Amino acid sequence: MAYAQTKTIAVEKIPVIDTAPLRFGTSEAAQAVALKIRQAAEEVGFFYICNHGISEAVIEQAYRAAQGFFSRPKKWKNSVKINSNHHGFLSVGEAKMEQAERVDLKESFVWGLDLPDDHPSVTEKNPFLGRNQWPKEMPELQKGVYPFFEAGLQCGRNMMRAFALGIELPEDSFL
């Protein structure tokens, strides 16, 4: 995949959608949010969300843990170099979008849903699934970032429900 073409849009034209009703509201309130999301996707192609349920404390904890990891020397970070499940550290220049001519100029630490080795999705050799790897000398990385991942996963599930409702499908269609 090559880099996408972009267009300019005034920031004030990007809708900000309050997603709290997806978590706490009535089904009618959730439907109203879903319709706003659909309208934004169709008319603008992008939107911001607020009241998504990821607390500032969880965000700050993840940020501090990531800073602690990325401030370490490359040799140390390579102790958790990316594995066959695509979990772990990638150094500058090691990531490149498919068919792109240039590499990404960033470091990454990739983790995901932590699944045991005997989980059916892992034993079926699904790519990107499996046990995460964390640096043994830095247990605060996992403790700092995994709650952010879990909160983001829940937010994503709420958004998938809204996408389904917005196109008049049962809300669990994409879950």
Positions of predicted regions on the chain:
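Peripheral, non-catalytic segments flanking oxidoreductase cores
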Residues: 1-175
